[in-house]
Amino acid sequence: MRKLALVPIQFYRYAISPLMASHCRFYPSCSCYAYEAIENHGLLRGGWLSIRRLGRCHPWNPGGYDPVPAVPTSRSSSMAE
């Protein structure tokens, strides 16, 4: 399911985005952010992070560097070692 959700993002990045001027206020771009968020966090959490990011991408937001949050590590696996 995750791979299927990434297909439209890839299509946008390689077929549509090059035809438009760069308008994203953030680094990485919103499409890169969405791809990475879904790839790292899964469809639900990554999708939610992407929607929140798109909601912040507007002319009144200064933008800047906004990386995808790191995947939380499990405390139980680190304590088992």
Swiss-Prot record:
SMART domains: Haemolytic. Keywords: Cell inner membrane, Cell membrane, Membrane. It is found in: Cell inner membrane. It is a peripheral membrane protein. Its main location: membrane. GO terms for cellular component: plasma membrane. NCBIfam families: membrane protein insertion efficiency factor YidD. Could be involved in insertion of integral membrane proteins into the membrane. Belongs to the UPF0161 family. HAMAP family: UPF0161_YidD. This is Putative membrane protein insertion efficiency factor. The lineage of its organism: Bacteria, Pseudomonadati, Pseudomonadota, Gammaproteobacteria, Pseudomonadales.
